Amino acid sequence: MVFKRLLGAFGVGGPSVDTVLAVSRVSPGGFLTGEVRVKGGDFEAEIEHISLGLVTRIETEHSEGEHTGLGEFFRTEVSGPFKLGIGEERTVPFRVPVPWETPLTEVQGQPLNGMAMGVRTELAIAKAVDKGDLDPFSVAALPSQEAVLVAFSQLGFHFKSADLETGHLYGVQQRLPFYQEIEFYPPAQHSGRINEVELTFVADAGRLDIILEADKRGGHGSGHDSFGRFQVTHEQALQMDWPAEITAWLDGLAGQHHGGSHGVSYGGHDDGHHGHHGHYGHHEQHGHRSGPGMGAVVAAGAAGVVGGFVAAEAIDEIGDFFEGEEEEE
């Protein structure tokens, strides 16, 4: 038994863990449900806790360029300490809240190229190597978000890519330390003066911020970015004529002939259709660009972020997941 415990300290013959999701698709603000199945190994083990973390990939910008790192942006414990006997099997059900600002990985059933999401299970074992499991899941758009994305498709925008950036958006109540950029190629009628348009959603239970950023072409390389912002409730977003709103914003860009970052802000008025014009600032710690697409506009793909970087062992595990490999315990 002493020899088995010694081997257990190196991860040999220890407990195993497998997480089974009840559903593999959620929306921001929803719940990820399922159960963690634990099985005892060749020796009795002291389990310290079982935790679940939502993980993805994010791009950060520094003096030497851009860096892609893996991390988790939400973590919760689903079980406290307990003893696990030799060969004993236990099942721990869970219901984990999905943050409202969780980035999207698909639209209308089509994957967003550049995005992926996973839930990592950690089985912390006293005096032994911790065990883990990693399971992918997808994040579908809220109806209010999908209404905007559908409008982009109707206007002839073509999805380019999506990614996550560290930092916060100026003037936006943002909880997570990153934001998603969904990048589009403009329709033909705007391609002569706009390189691309980026779309960012920042949601909470009652409100949706929609931030638009146009990378404008300029003579002799003097292009600049222009911004637009809509702040509405989820109900208002479903009632708005988004093709008309986006078109009006694009048409307004044509009258901007001077450099710098400019924009139009639309407040959440009672009818949800009108706003006010104003100056809009740039992203704080803004890095690389990206954007979203819809149905026919969306391509397939994988990848996405950070709240605190995880340990090296977890990074290797997550890296395998984002490369599409299956983890073997």
Per-range role (PLM):
Residues 67:
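A glycine-rich, hydrophobic loop/mini-helix early in the fold
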Residues 297-311:
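Hydrophobic alpha-helical topogenic segments used for membrane insertion/localization
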Residues 53-58, 95-101, 109-128:
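Internal, hydrophobic beta-strand segments that form the core of beta-sheet-rich folds
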Residues 2-53, 63, 71-93, 97, ...:
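N-terminal leader-region detector that preferentially activates on the first domain or presequence
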